[in-house]
Design a protein with these regions (language model features):
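Active-site recognition of the HExxH zinc-binding catalytic motif
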Residues: 76-88
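Metalloprotease/metallohydrolase-associated module, dominated by Zn2+-dependent proteases
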Residues: 2-72, 89-172
Length: 172
């Protein structure tokens, strides 16, 4: 049975919890922080992710894992991702380790346990499937991951067959 994603009302609760975490940290640190865009488009095994793309900050949540473990994610994942955001704003991404001392200190400001990961039973949760590409060599065909395929296309990687030792060629 597939787990249903969280409802729009639950999404609003998550955004509100995210905002409250940021506001609470702002009061305690005597600094004003803005709420970055919050999306519910994350797939795979991660419940949440903070990322910066082209100088745009964003917090992403997995609606399926939140759907299965809503209360736990509200209490743990939200402050975890907010702490990444605040650590970035306060110290910069390149100056600190992802779960280093600075991040742990921000987690404590948020009254959250600075744990790195949660171990959930993901039965029924839609997991991201990596796309495979067809390649061939002198002796057989191969399914190459999207990451390796992109490396070949950019010219930054090449792969050979383990059996015949000939280069793998994209089969289209």
């Amino acid at each position: 049975m597939t787990v249903a994603p969280i409802t729009e009302l639950q999404q609003e609760q998550v955004v509100t919890a995210t905002r409250h975490c940021i506001e609470r940290a702002g009061k305690l640190l005597q600094q004003k922080f803005t709420l970055p865009p919050v999306t519910f488009d994350l797939r795979g095994r991660a419940a949440g992710m903070y990322r910066v793309r082209q100088a745009r900050r964003q917090i992403r949540y997995n609606p399926y894992i939140f759907g299965k473990y809503f209360t736990d994610n509200l209490a743990n994942t939200v402050p975890h991702e907010v702490a990444h955001y605040l650590t970035d704003v306060l110290y910069g991404l390149h100056n600190v380790r992802p779960h280093g001392r600075e991040w742990q200190a921000v987690m404590r400001v948020l009254d959250a346990e600075p744990s790195v990961t949660c171990h959930y039973d993901l039965t029924g949760v839609l997991l991201r499937r990596q796309r495979r590409f067809s390649y061939r060599c002198a002796c057989s065909s191969h399914a190459v991951s999207a990451v390796r395929h992109n490396r070949v296309q950019r010219g930054s990687g090449s792969y050979v067959c383990r059996q015949c030792r000939t280069p793998l060629v994209f089969a289209g």
